[in-house]
């Protein structure tokens, strides 16, 4: 016990400091304001506020910014409105953690207070310099009304402070400004910089003309004076690239990560596409001589590999030097209305941090919740070798499932009963899922109903649908979907189906699924993290202990629950809430 208390001492001290200055962190009561009569009571229920996903106590949150590890602490900065539950008044809020799960909020790190950011401090990244000092590159808005964008830099005021509580902005800001011919309103979100051949390099997202999204490349010898290269690192006719990210990968199948400046034979280039609000990436080669990035798949910019096929945007990765891994963070907005958000008093969460690495095939990334999440696991139940017949469902009982972690290995017999894939859908997984939702019976379709009411009036389906191989010798096509169309009886909710194809061979009949259920968010990982889907849902009946969990089979063949284990999840320290 003594060792445990010593380990907790830094946390307890910081928690006391936060409570002593709580007025700086929690801007008003956690009780929502008087809700208009048009807002359902369930929407403002505290039981719909997430239990273990990252969020501040109140108000608006969006992009994760500048994650880093420094002197024993993980730091996360994020776009935050301290004055309300809608976008605006953006500052860089700041939280710290020793495990990426329990978080304590500090004072905002970066606020509009110099000419080159006086109208906004937008997204950016952190870079650890050779002497160990962190530097933040971020976008500033320096003119009213037109969102004229420039890039700024900030350094810790006191590098000996492990909490990095104060930041200073040199007088030479801004360090990069739009040049003639560049769209100054589409020039933002600098990346973590990398160092090679005597130069630092960073990317800034941009748009040329109406359609050409690009990653501007900048170089600097001293991290102070930045010069734009003659050509971008990469570009494609996709629309504006927000929040670009560029990082090296280990060899296929190796789960360790690499620092951004370590050279590699494979890289990821990711962009957050402003037109669709999804995060896309490619795996490819970085030619250090020509300073160009080339995707392995020539059509990769348009085939649209995504980190997450659901509600997940403006993501950022960083290298964790403690566990030698690359960690992915992303933002999930609400799927209710602005009226509802104002009534709740809060809007937005971050996804659970994920470890990312290159699949053994070398074609895509794999993602998995960081291992620290398992420290929140509590009471559990297990199910073995349970057969679920066609048209039937099986309830998992013995624990609360509104805040849970569920891992299930499933086997399906009778793959010959799978439907043929209509070529009219092409590679449009979302449209296919919309047409072939969870309640469409036949073929091979099975999965979980989560946050379900006792009478199944409300339920969110996370499931697989299998289609026959497209040709001789081909493997069956596996579609993974989250279908929230029956997730709530409340009106005025956005309830889209989300879907992605799973690049796995189900010929053996085996597939796995993990779902993180957290009151108003369902975050799922198919086939060991090949396909991931996050969805926001707002049950009106399936709340708290009235939420249930089922395994369902709406196909024509038996399925077997080889092994299911579900855990209740405890609430971590979460920014004083």
From Swiss-Prot:
Where do glycans attach? 158, 183, 333
Q: What induces it?
A: By sugar in excised leaves. By rice blast fungus (M.grisea) 4 hours after infection.
Summarize tissue expression: Expressed in roots, leaves and flowers. Weakly expressed in seeds.
Q: Which residues form a coiled coil?
A: none
Q: Does the keyword Secreted apply?
A: yes
Protein keywords = Apoplast, Cell wall, Glycoprotein, Glycosidase, Hydrolase, Secreted, Signal
Q: Where in the cell is it found?
A: Secreted, Extracellular space, Apoplast; Secreted, Cell wall
List this protein's GO terms for biological process: carbohydrate metabolic process
Give a GO molecular function annotation for the protein.
beta-fructofuranosidase activity
Q: What are the record's GO terms for cellular component? A: apoplast
What's the Enzyme Commission number for this chain?
3.2.1.26
Give the signal sequence positions.
Answer: 1-22
**Top EC class per UniProt?**
hydrolase
- From what superkingdom does this record's organism come? Eukaryota
Catalysed reaction(s) here are: Hydrolysis of terminal non-reducing beta-D-fructofuranoside residues in beta-D-fructofuranosides
Q: Where along the chain is the active site annotated?
A: 63
What family does this belong to?
Belongs to the glycosyl hydrolase 32 family.
Free-text function comment from the UniProt entry: May play a role in sucrose partitioning during seed development and in stress response.
**By its UniProt entry, which PANTHER family does this protein fall under?**
BETA-FRUCTOFURANOSIDASE, INSOLUBLE ISOENZYME CWINV1-RELATED
- The protein depicted here goes by the name Beta-fructofuranosidase, insoluble isoenzyme 1
Q: Which gene encodes it?
A: CIN1
């Amino acid at each position: 016990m003594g060792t445990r208390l010593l380990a907790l001492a830094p946390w307890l001290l910081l928690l006391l400091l936060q409570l002593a200055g709580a007025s700086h962190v929690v801007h008003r009561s956690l009780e929502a304001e008087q809700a208009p009569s048009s807002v359902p009571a369930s929407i403002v229920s505290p039981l719909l506020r997430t239990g273990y996903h990252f969020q501040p106590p109140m108000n608006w949150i969006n992009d994760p910014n500048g994650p880093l590890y420094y002197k024993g602490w993980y730091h996360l900065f994020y776009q935050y409105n301290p004055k309300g539950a809608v976008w605006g008044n953006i500052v860089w809020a700041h939280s710290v953690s020793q495990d990426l799960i329990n978080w304590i909020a500090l004072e905002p790190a970066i606020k509009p207070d110099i000419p080159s950011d006086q109208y906004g401090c937008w997204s950016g990244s952190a870079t650890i310099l050779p002497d160990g000092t962190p530097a933040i590159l971020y976008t500033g808005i320096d003119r009213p009304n037109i969102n004229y964008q420039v890039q700024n830099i900030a350094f810790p005021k006191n590098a000996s402070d492990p909490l990095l509580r104060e930041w200073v902005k040199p007088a030479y800001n801004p360090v990069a400004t739009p040049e003639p011919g560049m769209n100054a309103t589409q020039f933002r979100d600098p990346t973590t910089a990398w160092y090679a051949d005597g130069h630092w390099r960073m990317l800034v997202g941009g748009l040329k003309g109406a359609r050409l999204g690009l990653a501007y490349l900048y170089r600097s010898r001293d991290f102070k004076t930045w010069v734009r290269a003659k050509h971008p690192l990469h570009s494609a006719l996709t629309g504006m690239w927000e929040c670009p990210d560029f990082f090296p990968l280990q060899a296929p199948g190796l789960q360790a990560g690499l620092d951004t400046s370590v050279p590699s034979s494979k890289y990821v280039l990711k962009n957050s596409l402003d037109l669709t609000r999804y995060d896309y990436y490619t795996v490819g080669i970085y030619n250090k001589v020509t300073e160009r990035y080339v995707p392995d798949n020539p059509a990769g910019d348009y085939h649209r590999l995504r980190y997450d096929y659901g509600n997940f945007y403006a993501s950022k990765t960083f290298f964790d030097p403690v566990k030698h891994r690359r960690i992915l963070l992303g933002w999930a907005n609400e799927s209710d209305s602005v009226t509802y958000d104002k009534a709740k008093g809060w809007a937005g969460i971050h996804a659970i941090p994920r470890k990312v690495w290159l699949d053994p095939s070398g074609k895509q990334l794999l993602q998995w919740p960081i291992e620290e999440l398992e420290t929140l696991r509590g009471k559990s139940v297990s199910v073995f070798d349970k057969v679920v017949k066609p048209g039937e469902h099986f309830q998992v009982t013995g624990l609360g499932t509104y805040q849970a972690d569920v891992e299930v290995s499933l086997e399906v017999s009778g793959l010959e009963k799978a439907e043929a894939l209509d070529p009219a859908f092409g590679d449009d997984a979302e449209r296919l899922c919309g047409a072939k939702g969870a309640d469409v019976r036949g073929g091979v379709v099975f999965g979980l109903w989560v946050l379900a009411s006792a009478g199944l009036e409300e339920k969110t389906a996370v499931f697989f649908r299998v289609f026959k191989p497209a040709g001789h010798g081909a493997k069956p096509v596996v579609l993974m979907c989250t279908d929230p169309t029956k997730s709530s009886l409340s009106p005025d909710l956005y309830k889209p189906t989300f879907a992605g194809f799973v690049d796995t061979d189900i010929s053996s009949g085996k597939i796995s699924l993990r779902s993180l259920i957290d009151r108003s968010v369902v975050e799922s990982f198919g086939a060991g993290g090949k396909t991931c889907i996050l969805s926001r849902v707002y049950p009106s009946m399936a709340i708290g202990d009235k939420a249930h969990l089922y395994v369902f089979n709406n196909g024509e063949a038996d399925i077997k629950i080889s092994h299911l284990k579900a855990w209740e999840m405890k609430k971590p320290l979460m920014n004083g809430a």
